[in-house]
A protein has these predicted regions:
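Conserved ABC transporter NBD signature motif
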Residues: 56-66
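Conserved ABC ATPase "signature" region
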Residues: 66, 103, 115-132
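ABC ATPase NBD coupling module
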Residues: 67-84
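Short coil-to-helix segment of the ABC ATPase nucleotide-binding domain corresponding to the Q-loop/switch region
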Residues: 96-104
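Conserved ABC ATPase signature
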Residues: 136-140, 144
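Conserved catalytic motifs of ABC-family nucleotide-binding domains
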Residues: 157
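Catalytic Walker B motif of ABC-type/P-loop ATPase nucleotide-binding domains
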Residues: 161-164
Length: 222
């Protein structure tokens, strides 16, 4: 599914951030640990195509495709069907309803048909926010917005889910729902990478997943 080899990234003249080597198969998840500045968000940006994999900075192969060979438009095309992206800041569009936000990936691809609408509604039910479907995102709590953001990332059933600090500032109930839905996605054959410093992630995962959905942990070098 995903193979990362000797990957690094450099911002301007700053020292390069090194991510080393790792791989991820379908039906598995990785938990990225590391302090502030370790590059957790940068790594996710590289994997989802927001940042380019620079020449001589290693390789990333996703579902048999080398990301460093892709143009900007081709990288943008990874989202949302190859990669589902849940950024640290939720970035829900305030001009759309919650349902329209969840449906947005399908709408942008011209695939907002009846089946897509039914899937979006089903996702809202699974995240316990179906009653908020026709509200604007600015009326949501932090936890509700996080659930809507994850539902949007899962809307197109991507091969790989990237979640940046998905439980940040959430209460226990919302954190549990978010991790449970990520675990279900992995149990269904997806692959996920979670970047987080939340010590509750692993215990939450163990409480909601079965032995078939493993959560391995890697520490990014300082």
């Amino acid at each position: 599914m995903l193979t990362v080899t000797n990957l690094s990234h450099q911002y301007g003249t700053n020292a390069a951030i090194s991510f080393g080597n790792f791989s991820l198969d379908a039906g598995h998840a990785l938990l990225l640990r590391g302090g502030s500045g370790a590059g957790k968000s940068t790594l996710l940006h590289l994997l989802c195509g927001v940042l380019p994999v620079q020449a001589a900075s290693g390789t990333v192969v996703l579902a048999g495709q080398s990301l460093q060979t892709l143009t900007r438009s081709e990288r943008d095309g990874l989202r949302p069907y190859a990669v589902g992206w849940m950024p640290q800041r939720q970035f829900l569009m305030t001009s759309l309803t919650v349902l329209e936000n969840v449906l947005l990936p399908a709408s942008l691809a011209g695939r907002a048909d009846d089946a897509a609408c039914k899937r979006a509604t089903a996702l809202l039910h699974s995240f316990a926010i179906a009653d908020l479907a026709h509200l604007r995102p600015q009326t949501l709590s932090v936890g509700q917005a996080a659930r809507a953001s994850l539902a949007r990332a899962l809307m197109t059933q991507p091969k790989l889910l990237l979640a940046d600090e998905p439980t940040a500032a959430l209460d226990a109930v919302s954190s549990g729902l978010v991790i449970e839905q990520i675990a279900r996605y992995v149990q269904g054959g997806g692959a996920a990478i979670i970047a987080s410093h939340d010590p509750a992630i692993h215990p939450l995962w163990d409480s909601v997943s079965n032995s078939d959905a493993t959560l391995d942990e890697i520490e990014l070098p300082k």
